[in-house]
């Protein structure tokens, strides 16, 4: 959003009804995990980004928690308390998320003939995409994810 023109200046207050709102979607559920409102429920019921002006300043951030919650809840026709608890306690990283893409880029690095780096990448290749403390590569994956994504979480 360019800030060098008066186009972006507020001249009046936006009516409450004009703000993005998702009420009683057909899916029966909403997710709020500090994510953009375009990813709050099943894809068929989400708000459409193009329906809202970029001048509203709506953050576009999509967290792993939002991606995972939507991915896990979307196929459920009914959500039991046990299923909701499993979603809440999920330790996985969504394949569409930035963390998994970052790990994929790390795995593509040339180790430059360094056996220590080659060994670390072999271990990282075994990562199952979760941080449940069960996999041998969990700690390494956590350390790799933590630093570049520290400003998001």
Regions from the PLM with identified roles:
Residues 1-153:
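Long, compositionally biased non-active-site segments enriched in small/hydrophobic residues and glycine
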């Amino acid at each position: 959003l360019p800030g060098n023109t008066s186009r972006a200046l507020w001249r009046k207050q936006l009516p409450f009804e004009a703000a993005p709102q998702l009420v009683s979607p057909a899916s029966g559920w909403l997710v709020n995990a500090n994510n953009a409102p375009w990813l709050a429920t099943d894809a068929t019921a989400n708000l459409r980004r193009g329906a809202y002006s970029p001048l509203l300043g709506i953050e576009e951030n999509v967290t792993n928690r939002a991606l995972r919650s939507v991915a896990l809840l979307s196929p459920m026709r009914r959500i039991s308390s046990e299923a909701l608890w499993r979603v809440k306690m999920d330790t996985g990283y969504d394949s569409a998320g930035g963390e998994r893409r970052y790990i994929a880029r790390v795995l593509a690095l040339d180790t430059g003939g360094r056996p220590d780096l080659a060994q670390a990448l072999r271990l990282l290749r075994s990562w199952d995409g979760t941080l449940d403390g069960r996999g041998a590569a969990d700690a390494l994956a956590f350390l790799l994810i933590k630093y570049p994504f520290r400003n998001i979480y």
